[in-house]
Swiss-Prot record:
Its EC number is 2.7.11.1. Changing K180E: Loss of kinase activity. This is Serine/threonine-protein kinase PBL34. Involved in chitin-triggered immune signaling and is required for reactive oxygen species (ROS) production. Acts downstream of SD129 in defense signaling triggered by the pathogen-associated molecular pattern (PAMP) 3-OH-C10:0, a medium-chain 3-hydroxy fatty acid. The modification Phosphoserine is found at S279, S309. Residues 142-428 form the Protein kinase domain. GO terms for molecular function: ATP binding; protein serine kinase activity; protein serine/threonine kinase activity. It catalyses: L-seryl-[protein] + ATP = O-phospho-L-seryl-[protein] + ADP + H(+); L-threonyl-[protein] + ATP = O-phospho-L-threonyl-[protein] + ADP + H(+). The keyword Glycosyltransferase does not apply.
Length: 493
């Protein structure tokens, strides 16, 4: 199930149409060039890079690739970068240990847009194999209206297929799916695609997004996922005007915890997720949480070993400090990231937000003094909840977040213990708005002229700096880019 034993070779390239160099070219060549130019004009007319850029970027041009595949329905729109990006691609990402606005590019793995791939696919028997034409028709020819989102590495489209087959069906019927494409301009996207199919294709759990199938046809690589109609947790917490109700937040926290617990303690081969964050938690129609995007997932260390040494990857603000400092990855790194997300759900604040006052940019550092102080914990609560939260539940969440965010990874709880702690919280009815304490506290703050602003976050502004930036328009899966930090000596990827 790992990425190490691999054996399918092919050249992976994407070429833009070339202009005619000689007016006396044969008629056949002239017709070919004319056809390519018509495709370009059609793409520009669409008002979106879907037609032209999609055909040249999202969907690779024909080449000699035999076996490979593409796309991730998760934090990015096509395949995300794992160790590097193609040399000609710009990035807004940054290493996990640094916060800067400088643009960084890494080509540690690939310095060409036509890398030679040599990897092994471990495709599960339950996955459906689609033809490219099936997916083209299911998404209505990849038209802009079907576009769920786009990112630096490709696009995600909404499609409809047979309930138990691969044939396309009329929109609104059959099974709704998300079809993700792979931009072939770099080895890293392919590596993350391999991780996605090798992990998510072999892991089945109610709290993991289901991989329905794949397409490997010439140099076309696409992946097909179950459609998640409510999009990402990030979208609901930070991009919508109506606040997410407390009980729903707790339901989502519990579901996400169950997903991590399965990966760490129940999977046949334990897995470290390595990229747990709000944008990778997708929601179905009933707000059931499912983890998406396994592009950075790693096999847990073998028995007798304490950690995996690897290049630091992920999103700034979520990565555990010991992992950032040493590159030593353990399941407790995921537990720390869970604590950050729990804090985001509690406060309504992003893990990193430079639009906030000095001292409040980093959510964890700002929140630490309040986490274990019963007199100050109320300052953490999302003001948009307006007292519609369980007092006991909020106290339990702050305690749990403090444990998960411990600087000593050995003190952090196992995810199975987190699940047990969260189970009762969605059903608690002791709303703060009806308590004398909360009403008195609110009155005192108003009297002091602090209103909601003291310790409470307003609506968040720009997204935090990341090595993989994210967005989730139209309920689609989020997108991200990432930038690796220097690789530790002897580390693997």
């Amino acid at each position: 199930m790992g990425l190490d034993a691999v054996k399918a070779k092919g050249n992976w390239k994407s070429e833009k149409p070339k202009e005619t160099e000689n007016k006396n070219h044969k008629k056949k060549n002239g017709d070919d060039n004319k056809s390519r130019n018509e495709e370009e004009e059609e793409g520009e007319a669409s008002g979106c890079w879907v037609k032209f850029r999609f055909m040249i970027g999202c969907i690779p041009s024909k080449s000699d690739l035999d076996a490979s595949s593409s796309s991730i329905y998760g934090s990015n729109c096509t395949v995300t970068t794992m160790e590097s990006k193609s040399a000609n691609e710009k990035s807004n990402d940054q290493p996990v240990g640094q916060v800067s606005s400088t643009t960084t590019t890494s080509n540690a793995e690939s310095s060409s847009s036509t890398p030679v791939i040599s990897e092994e696919l471990n495709i599960s028997s339950h996955l459906r194999k689609f033809t490219f034409n099936d997916l083209k028709l299911s998404t209505r020819n990849f038209r802009p209206e079907s576009l769920l989102g786009e990112g630096g590495f490709g696009c995600v489209f909404k499609g409809w297929i047979e309930e138990n087959g691969t044939a396309p069906v009329k929109p609104g019927t059959g099974l709704t799916v998300a079809v993700k494409t792979l931009n072939p301009d770099g080895l890293q996207g392919h590596k993350e695609w391999l991780a996605e199919i090798n992990f998510l294709g072999n892991l089945l759990h109610p709290n993991l997004v289901k991989l329905v199938g794949y397409c490997i046809e010439d140099d076309q690589r696409l992946l097909v996922y179950e459609f998640m109609p409510r999009g990402s947790l990030e979208n609901h917490l930070f991009r919508r005007s109506l606040p997410l109700p407390w009980s729903i937040r707790m339901k989502i926290a519990l579901g996400a915890a169950k997903g991590l617990s399965f990966l760490h303690e129940e999977a046949l081969k334990p897995v470290i997720y390595r990229d747990f964050k709000t944008s990778n938690i997708l929601l179905d129609a009933d707000y059931n949480a499912k983890l998406s995007d396994f592009g950075l997932a790693k096999d847990a260390p073998d028995e007798g070993k304490t950690h995996v040494s690897t290049r630091v990857m992920g999103t700034y603000g979520y990565a555990a400090p010991e992992y950032v400092m040493t590159g030593h990855l353990t399941s407790k790194s995921d537990v720390y990231s869970f604590g950050v997300v729990l804090l985001e759900m509690l406060t309504g604040r992003r893990s990193m937000d430079k639009n906030r006052p000095n001292g409040e940019h980093n959510l964890v550092e700002w929140a630490r003094p309040h986490l274990l102080d019963k007199r100050r914990f109320y300052r953490l609560l999302d003001p948009r909840l307006e007292g519609h939260f369980s007092i006991k539940g909020a106290q339990k969440v702050t305690q749990l977040a403090a444990q998960c965010l411990s600087r000593d990874p050995k003190i952090r709880p196992k995810m199975s213990d987190v699940v047990e702690a969260l189970k009762p919280l969605p059903h608690l009815k002791d709303m703060a708005s009806s308590s004398y304490y909360f009403q008195t506290m609110q009155a005192e703050r108003l009297k002091n002229g602090s209103g909601r602003s003291q310790g409470f976050g307003s609506r968040n502004g720009q997204h935090q700096p990341v090595f993989r930036t994210l967005s989730s328009p139209h309920g689609s899966s989020p997108y991200r880019h990432q930038i690796p930090s220097p690789k530790p000596k002897g580390a693997t990827t």
